[in-house]
Every structure is written in C-alpha cells, then in structure tokens.
Amino acid sequence: MKDKFGREIRSLRISITNKCNLQCFYCHREGHDSNNDRYMTPEEIGIIAKTSTKFGVKKIKISGGEPLLRKDVCEIIENIKDERIKDISLTTNGILLENLAEKLKDAGLNRVNVSLDTLNPELYKKITKFGDVERVINGIKKAIDVSLTPLKVNFLAMSINIKDLPDIMEFCRDIGAILQIIEFIPLKEELKGYYYNISPIENEIKEKADKVITRNFMQNRKKYIVDGLEIEFVRPMDNSEFCMHCTRIRLTYDGYLKPCLLRDDNLVDVLTPLRKGENLEPYFIECINRREPYFKIK
C-alpha cells in the first residue's frame, strides 16, 4: 500500500521495550517519550507484524530501548517469523550480544546493527555513563561468528567523537562490517554543542570511493565502497530526500503505530483494538493515511 504521497510501505520498526542498560546522554527514546508500563506480548507483536505484511511490509527491525533486555526476545523473533517477511534485524548497544548471539540466530534473526560511537574505553563510558566497550566489541565479533550478517556498526557522529572515526572505519574494515555514519539530532537545546556537520565527511568519502551505489528503497541513500569498506550516511534532519523516499512505519513498545520518526502527535493505538479482538487492518490504513514527509521539498 502507498501513502497519499506515493510512498510504499516496506518495513516496520518495532520497539519492544523502553528500558536500557546504558544512559547515553543523547538518547531520544525512539522519539516516543513515554513511561507507560503497557508492554506487548510476543504473540501480540507477532500478530501486528504479520498484519503489516498485508500492506507491503517485508522487513522488520527490532529495537528498544535495548531489545536484548527482554528475556523473551527470542520468542518475539519466533513469533515474527513469516514467509512473507524476508528480513528480521535487530538494533542493539551490544552489551548483552555476545551471550545471546547464537540463540538469536537460532530463533530466526537474520542480522544485527550495533551502536558503537568510539573504541576508546574512557570516552565510551563518558557517552554511555557506565558501558564497557570491550563487551560491545566481543558481541560484534560473536555476532559475525554466528552469521548475524551483514552486520552494521552505527556510529553517531558528534563533536566529541568525530576524531575516532578513522579508528572505527579501520575496525569495520578488519571485521567485515558495514559502517553507518549517522547525523546527530540535537533535540534539546543543551545538546546543540555536540552537533557535527557530516556533509564534508561524506564529500571526502565520495571522492575516495571506488564505487557508489544508490539504495532506492532506503531514502535513496548512497552506499560508498572505500578500500573494501561499505559506508552509508544517515541524515534525517532537514532532508527532504530522506522523507520523500521513506518506506518505514514504526510500532512503539506500548503498542502505537507511529507514522513518522520525527512526530509524536499522530500515533495510532493498535494494541487496544488487538486486545478487544478487532481487525487491525483499519488501524494500519489510518496510520498510512496519516503519513506525510516531515521535511518537504521547498
């Protein structure tokens, strides 16, 4: 199904918890700032995910909070699995990944994205408050060992860690990971000092690239191949191109369909009708009809 701007729906991002075992100073809680204790069960998540396939969803991304904190995360993956869903991935901070990687693979997970903003233990602890970067590195290596691949490393580019980017690039090249360089979105006034313009970096990478590929169903995002390393740039802010080609809807941990990453005022409650035994399709249609580009072409 297409929204009224002609954008097809191809993926669903499911937040399965609002809890996290780190306290990163920049965290925006998936754009849904709620302390609701209403959680979806694995079965409910499975029903919602499978309903989404009727509207064109073929890819599911599991996120949080930190999704690996849910002890039933493997059961959730098993409930999501469906022949119509071609790819199930999960975004994690990696702290718990080493011990869970094999179980996640056995449950049906295809691949993981791991957040890694620095390899420097002191800076990592400063960013996350009390995280151990060695656990993340070990988790990444274990995930690759059990074929949760292609593995992507998410690097959030900020003024305090941009100097570490070359080391992150070398690390990703050595282990065969894809690197995503993500633009920092300073949603609070006190965070604006951490903003870093990644446009010059993208231009530099583009000049060095051996090959450039356009991902047509991922906001027309460019993928650069540099000395064997795949690099992508994610720039949602003030980016009409990002919005124009967006094919994703979101499901919050407490059961609301979210038409837009950057809006929290047009959610559609899907968990309440599910628990009443209602058909969920009208709620998906309502969500899709509420979709519009946050940043429009000027």
From Swiss-Prot:
Gene for this chain: moaA
The keyword Metal-binding belongs to this UniProt entry's keyword annotation: yes
SMART domains the UniProt entry points to: Elp3 (SM00729)
Role played: Catalyzes the cyclization of GTP to (8S)-3',8-cyclo-7,8-dihydroguanosine 5'-triphosphate.
E.C. no: 4.1.99.22
Residue spans crossing the bilayer: none
GO terms classed as biological process: Mo-molybdopterin cofactor biosynthetic process
Protein name (record): Probable GTP 3',8-cyclase
Binding site for GTP: 13, 61, 91, 152, 248-250
Binding site for [4Fe-4S] cluster 1: 20, 24, 27
